[in-house]
Curated annotation (Swiss-Prot):
EC class of the enzyme, as a word: transferase
GO biological process annotation, one example: heme O biosynthetic process
NCBIfam families in UniProt: cyoE_ctaB, PRK04375.1-2
Keyword Protein biosynthesis included in the entry's annotation: no
Name this polypeptide is given: Protoheme IX farnesyltransferase
Organism: Prochlorococcus marinus (strain AS9601)
TM segment ranges: 64-84, 110-130, 133-153, 161-181, 189-209, 246-266, 287-307
Enzyme Commission number(s) of this protein: 2.5.1.141
UniProt family annotation: Belongs to the UbiA prenyltransferase family. Protoheme IX farnesyltransferase subfamily.
Amino acid sequence: MNSSNLENLNYKSSIRDEVVPSRKKLTLPPWLEVAKPRLIPLLLATTLGGMALTEEWPLSSPKLICTLGGGALAAAAAGALNCLWEMELDKRMTRTSKRALPAGKLSSETVFLAAVSCTLAASMLLVSGVNYLAAGLTLLGLFSYVILYTVILKPRTTKNIVFGGVAGAIPPLVGASAATGHVGLSGWWLFGLVMLWTPAHFWALAILLKDDYASVGIPMLPSVKGSVFTAKAISRYGWATVLMSIMGVFALPEGGLLYGIMLLPFNGRLLQLINELKKSPDDLSRAKSLFRWSILYMFGICLLLLISRTQLSVEFEQQSMQIFLSIVSLLSN
């Protein structure tokens, strides 16, 4: 290997270390590591978003705690089963070889029993404290992540995250069903938004890790089609995400005006980063920036949904309508 190639690999490695939380920088106990706790907060945020889209918001504290607690336990179980299934694959990748299972810090039996225990606990909590539909949807999300994405799609197709993203899009349905006992159109809107957001979000990370995926034969889009093709795909899904996010103005029972106004800078920044990556698809720092912002973007959307259901938002809409009617009255005279 010549010096230029070595420098390029070192550069990519340093960028990856900045994007993917390093075990050297943040060491988790083995039992917590396999639960993939970094993924759970965003899943719970979209669950809250699904709740905020219903007329029943805010929920009672017991139901809220049971919904979020059950969701966290199910997500932990899904993470553990994912680690268990991919243990041999992780051993072959430098980035993942020191994880708890491939490094032998935990036994397969222990992780499997923990996953089953978390699944049972989540089911009991949701059935007893929420409702059967919320419990069933949560288990469907777990099944989708472990079986549909991890086992079936991930090792077989570049569209793995497009269809496998359904697992990450189910929490809004759980939130809506927890609040009302059914899933309305607003809940399906947030489901669709997460589905469209997921490929653009994940492919930005996959650009940084494309060599790792290629080395073990995982057909992630950047590894198979290259960064240029992937950046164009990210752009398409990014624009679709922006257009879908605007529909939230109509999905909210109230507060849509404030949501729409506060949404503008989020969408503007997302499109800016997507455009920058499209211009320089091999620039890992741009992929890193887009990946990071995409996470903040979805957290931001959920926060906007919650803010839009406050009394402040209702008063803002009322005052805005009064100002609008006053302007119309002045112009008509």
